[in-house]
C-alpha cells in the first residue's frame, strides 16, 4: 500500500514536471521566434515608416512599398497578417485594408511595445481587430515590435505581425 502511494505521488510529480517543461519549451520557442522575426521584419519595414517621424502620417509611396513587400516576397510568405499601430490604438497600415484608420483599445502587449519591448504570444483571435485573422486561422503566433526612427531611436509606431503556429508546434514536438 505504501509502495502504491509512492508510485502515485511519483507519477503525479512526473506529469506536473512534464507539463511545466512543455510550457517552458513553448514559451522559449515563442519568444525566440518573435524576437528573430521582429529583427527580420524591422530590417525591411522600418525604412518605409520613417516619414512618421516628421508628420505622423504614412506616405502613399510607403504604403505601396509595404504592400509589395508583404505580398510577393519571402517575408510575405512568412507573415500571414501585418499591422502598424499608433500609440493611441489607431491602425495606420494593415494587410486587411478594412481596419486601416480604425481605433481599438490599447492592449498591454501594444503598450509594452511602445515602451520598447518585443512581445510574442499565441494570439487571442477573439479581439475585435482580429476579425480577418479569426476567419482564416484557428491559432496564430502574434508579435508586437517597436519601430524606431533611424536618426533618434525614438519609437515611431509598433508593428504587429502574425505567423502560423506550424513551426512552433513542430519545434515543441521535436523537444518532447
Model-predicted regions and their roles:
Residues 92, 98-175:
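Extracytoplasmic
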Residues 3, 33-37, 74, 93, ...:
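Short acidic/polar alpha-helix capping motifs at helix-coil junctions
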Residues 47-105:
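Extracytoplasmic/periplasmic helical hairpin
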Residues 1-8, 29, 173-176:
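Structural motif marking the loop-to-transmembrane transition
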Residues 33-45, 88, 112-124:
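Conserved long hydrophobic alpha-helices within structured protein cores
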Amino acid at each position: 500500500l505504501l509502495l502504491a502511494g509512492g508510485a502515485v505521488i511519483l507519477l503525479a510529480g512526473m506529469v506536473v514536471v512534464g507539463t511545466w517543461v512543455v510550457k517552458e519549451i513553448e514559451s522559449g520557442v515563442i519568444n525566440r521566434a518573435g524576437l528573430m522575426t521582429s529583427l527580420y521584419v524591422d530590417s525591411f519595414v522600418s525604412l518605409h515608416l520613417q516619414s512618421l517621424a516628421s508628420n505622423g502620417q504614412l506616405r502613399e509611396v510607403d504604403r505601396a512599398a509595404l504592400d509589395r513587400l508583404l505580398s510577393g516576397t519571402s517575408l510575405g510568405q512568412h507573415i500571414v497578417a501585418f499591422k502598424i499601430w499608433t500609440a493611441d490604438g489607431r491602425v495606420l497600415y494593415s494587410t486587411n485594408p478594412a481596419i486601416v484608420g480604425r481605433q481599438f483599445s490599447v492592449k498591454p502587449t501594444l503598450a509594452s511595445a511602445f515602451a520598447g519591448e518585443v512581445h510574442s504570444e499565441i494570439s487571442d483571435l477573439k479581439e475585435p481587430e482580429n476579425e480577418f485573422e479569426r476567419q482564416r486561422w484557428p491559432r496564430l503566433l502574434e508579435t508586437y515590435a517597436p519601430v524606431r526612427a533611424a536618426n533618434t531611436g525614438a519609437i515611431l509606431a509598433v508593428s504587429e505581425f502574425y505567423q502560423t503556429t506550424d513551426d512552433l508546434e513542430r519545434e515543441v514536438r521535436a523537444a518532447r
